[in-house]
Amino acid sequence: LSCVPTLCLNAALRLQFADTAHFAFSGRLKRRIMPFFICLSAMNPLNLPQELPIARYRLHFTLTHDLQLPPYAASTLRGVFGHALLAAACTCDTPQTPHLPDCPYAQIFEPAPCADLPGSIRQSPPPPYLIETPLVAPTHFPAGAGYAFDLVLFGRARHSLPLIAAVFAQAFAKGLGANNAGKGELSGIAVQQADGSFLTISERGSPIALHDNHIRLPERYPTQARIQLLTPLRIQQ
């Protein structure tokens, strides 16, 4: 994909499907879990392909030093990832603003403007990755404990998994969290399967095994979806 046709939402969604079709909205939009319903065609309403170039991975680390993270750790992980990626993968001779189009750092972390995207995100396309941390999780992890988070890759970014994993390994080796004191070693990488389970594809720095990195879509779709908001959502338009 030359650009990533994705919409980044500041809300986590959980879908449940039912058989009957109607539209309903329950409750006012507040900071709490709240369901609402949307209508779907029983066939393929968007004429989607059989597969989408999306893969979800889980990165496991073994901590060598105590790690202290804020309640919502994804922002912290994104920050250390960006700094480590810039140091490891930027191919520009001098700092560029914006980076050159073929710079791996730019392709992953700061995508160039793309005319094929909607106007609201044309100049600043969403990056082709998402970092997902548990909504409810401890903030302190002692040395010797494990720490894991999910990484969703879109389009061509899936083929950069070895680079991205190596960059996260460098970030954890250097330190993150409070005072950059938390350190750890990458102990495993797993990919999510169609049934929701995770399959280990690398352990302790071993080469990443070949694996399916697509989402396969169903041939038929239910007529109703129930969406449960797990984080606050503000609908502007």
Task: List each language-model region with its residue ranges.
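RNA-interacting cores
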Residues: 40-237
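Intrinsic disorder/low-complexity segments
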Residues: 1-42
